[in-house]
């Protein structure tokens, strides 16, 4: 057997690099925190594009990709949102807020669409973290006023807002329940 290959046509170095990247993903999952206080620094357009690209690659049932995004960057719109959102300070001070909507016409099953949008949101949070940014997912926002401010279409339903920016500080990790409390094996 060829020493450059590892059981097939995949060079061993590529397998090692893949394992290294996987460790980066696992590290990002463990280190990511919800950031609620931001520095005023703007987000570079290429970083924002990378975050949206990561969101686009989330899994969805039947590949329906039911998510749509409205990127709120203007101070005026952030102030307007801040007047109607409970977490107003985060929305006002984060340089970017991404509204994540469900396109009701694109999906095939509401529950599966919402699950897919959850995966999409996790991609946004992890991508932001990996780029040195912080983010926080704001739920409980099914508010017609918010949908009007962001210009949601008739077939779109607001699922969440995600505020993104450079963290003013990185909070310490919160305790997690042990797997023994969360997992049953049968």
Task: For the regions a language model picked out, list residue spans one by one.
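Acidic, surface-exposed loops and disordered segments
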Residues: 2-5, 9-186
């Amino acid at each position: 057997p060829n020493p450059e290959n590892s059981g097939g046509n995949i060079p061993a170095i590529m397998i090692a690099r893949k394992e290294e990247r996987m460790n980066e993903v696992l590290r990002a999952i463990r280190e990511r925190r919800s950031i609620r206080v931001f520095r005023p620094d703007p987000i570079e357009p290429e970083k924002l594009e990378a975050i949206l690209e990561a969101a686009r690659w989330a899994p969805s049932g039947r590949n329906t990709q039911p998510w749509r995004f409205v990127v709120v960057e203007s101070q005026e719109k952030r102030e307007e949102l801040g007047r109607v959102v409970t977490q107003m300070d985060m929305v006002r001070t984060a340089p970017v807020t991404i509204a994540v909507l469900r396109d009701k016409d694109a999906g095939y099953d509401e529950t599966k669409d919402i699950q897919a949008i959850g995966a999409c949101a996790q991609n946004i949070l992890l991508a932001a973290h990996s780029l040195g940014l912080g983010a926080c997912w704001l739920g409980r926002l099914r508010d017609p006023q918010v949908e009007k401010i962001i210009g949601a279409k008739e077939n779109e339903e607001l699922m969440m807002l995600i505020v993104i920016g450079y963290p003013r500080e990185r909070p310490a990790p919160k305790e997690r329940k042990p797997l023994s409390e969360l997992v049953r094996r049968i």
